[in-house]
C-alpha cells in the first residue's frame, strides 16, 4: 500500500503532540496524532453525507443509517459487540449526523486500539443491517427528532429553509 504524506499541520508551539496527515491508496484521508502523555487512543471517521442528502420520501435516512451501523457486522454479528468491547476496555463511543456530515468516533485504552479499529472499520465495510432492529431504530431516531424539534436553533434554521428555493439543497 502506498501512503502519500499531506502537507504539514500547523500547531501551537505549546502542543507537544505529533501530527501526520496521509492519503491512503483508496483516497481515504487520515490524520494521525501521537500523544505519549495519555493512556487512551481514539479514532473518528467523518463521512461527507448528512441529513441534507436524505431523499424527500425518506427523511431521517442518514441518521437511521448512523444508528444501524452499530448493530453488528459480518465479522462481529452480535449487535452489542462493538459497544461492549469499547466499554470493557475503558472507552466510549458515539456518532452524530449533521446537515452534510455523519461522524463516528470512539476512545479506548491504548493497548486495545488495533482490535477496536478492526471492529470500527467492519461497521463501514460489512454492516449487517439486521431487519430485526429496523423498527427500534426508526423509533429511536424519531424520538431524538421530537426531543430536539423545538430547539430554537433548529427552528430558526427551519424557518430559513422555508424562505429558500425548493430546488436549493438546504
Located regions from the model:
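Short, conserved secondary-structure transition motifs
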Residues: 142-148
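M16/MPP (pitrilysin/insulinase) zinc-metallopeptidase core fold and M16-derived inactive scaffolds
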Residues: 42-107, 150-152
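Peptidyl-prolyl cis-trans isomerase
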Residues: 34-36
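Scaffold signal of the M16-like zinc-metallopeptidase fold and its non-catalytic homologs
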Residues: 2, 72-73, 116, 123-124, ...
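Proteolytic maturation boundary segments
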Residues: 1-32
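M16/insulysin-pitrilysin zinc metalloprotease superfamily fold
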Residues: 71-75, 107-140
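Solvent-exposed, polar/charged alpha-helical surfaces in well-ordered, non-transmembrane soluble domains
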Residues: 59, 80-84, 114, 118, ...
